[in-house]
Swiss-Prot record:
Heme binds at C486. It comes from Danio rerio. Its cofactor is heme. It holds the Pfam family p450. Its main location: membrane. Signal peptide: none annotated. GO terms for biological process: lipid metabolic process. This is Cytochrome P450 27C1. The keyword Hydrolase does not apply.
Amino acid sequence: MALQSTILHMARKNLLQESCRQLLIQTHGLHKSVASGSLEIAAHSQADLKEESAVSPAEEVQKAARVKSLKEMPGPSTVANLLEFFYRDGFSRIHEIQMEHAKKYGKIFKSRFGPQFVVSIADRDMVAQVLRSESATPQRGNMESWKEYRDLRGRSTGLISAEGDEWLKMRSVLRQLIMRPRDVAVFSSDVNDVVADLVKRVKTLRSQQDDSQTVLNINDLFFKYAMEGVATILYETRLGCLENEIPKMSQEYITALHLMFSSFKTTMYAGAIPKWLRPIIPKPWEEFCSSWDGLFKFSQIHVDKRLSEIKKQMEKSEEIKGGLLTHMLVTREMNLEEIYANMTEMLLAGVDTTSFTLSWSTYLLARHPTIQQQIFEEVDRVLGGRVPTGEDVPYLPLIRGLVKETLRLFPVLPGNGRVTHDDLIVGGYLIPKGTQLALCHYSTSMDEENFPRPEEFRPDRWIRKDASDRVDNFGSIPFGYGIRSCIGRRIAELEMHLALTQLLQNFHIEVSPQTTEVHAKTHGLLCPGASINLRFTDRK
């Protein structure tokens, strides 16, 4: 009875919302007709609306009465799930398990991992429904370990780990600085300086090999490029990651970051084990805390350094100029602990995500020389030999398509989490408020219904044929959607677009004979399962 009552209440609520939506659309249609001097537009809009949404209250209630409970939702048993992850190395195959479960149980299914109950959604339209129904402060999936560490150390949460009004305040500060392409384009000069060092580093590394062309383990190089590029924007300083000798402080950060991702599996183990067992199995939690200690220490040193410089400038009555960090320190829209936390989390989020995408992009270009040549010809036609800027990127649709297609095939986050803010009916099931959802982005991006021939690498699938053509959809949303989408998206795209463009200007990229076919594995993020070794031959 409780379930039926809830469903009927939601049916009435949905019907009321639909009625309001119809009224708004009709009003909009009438407004258009008055503005254009033609009543045909309004009449056509209303006719279409009547045809599309002529659902009676009785039909709406009858439809809602067919809604099922979570008990009726299919999914693997708890024992089967634990066996999959603990004994069959499921942690490194999360992206594959998504597709296996979607094929076996359907595009919405439930699972339990230790104390965590999750509803997984592997359907584009259902994902869209969930994201479009979010509140003003969407809640991510389970990040209790992040919050627990911050409570333990007395640290603030940052944009990734914060929730509610605290998160909304931080986002409102940061979004005005780095969310729009034109805002990020001002960093083109700084990023291009880093790209120039990347090109030099490619030449140095290949000269160390017998064939004078091969760069081994390309992801290590792109990791250092991404770290240098993100830090240049966030901290307004160079770290020396692309030098022959990396400074000690930067190397310590790299070590801490590697530890963070290497401890992903053990941290997941810890999430499935009650806290009272930590004294018996202490290593996962100790490594997790140790890596965060290193990351926060690194950020605090650089933030404090810039703060000291600003204070000296103010004492001398000098004009204070700078970028993102300077703005945050001068305006004081966040306190110092919040700045430490946000700098730490944004750097963490911006390094491996960018480096993995660049690794996959260059690997795909090397394996598809015809496509590589097409993209190079576009770059050469638009730029000639000059260095690109952020303003050039809109005129390089194949470069943009290259990044989008790479992220479709290898989404850095194979899945994303949400906690429902209200009761939802999704896929014919009533999902109660407070339920943890897993949005299966890898599965939707490889779905034939969303992308014909999904296994093929086709950057041109993202090019619009005309102004009315929309090729983007919820099947591939690597940066998320809506108000809780990735805050650093524009920075990451700028780094990738400028780097890929200039690598193609300088080199023809081939797969080294030392590299066999590389498959993806999940290691917190979706990363190459083996070293990618590439040959870089000068174009000139």
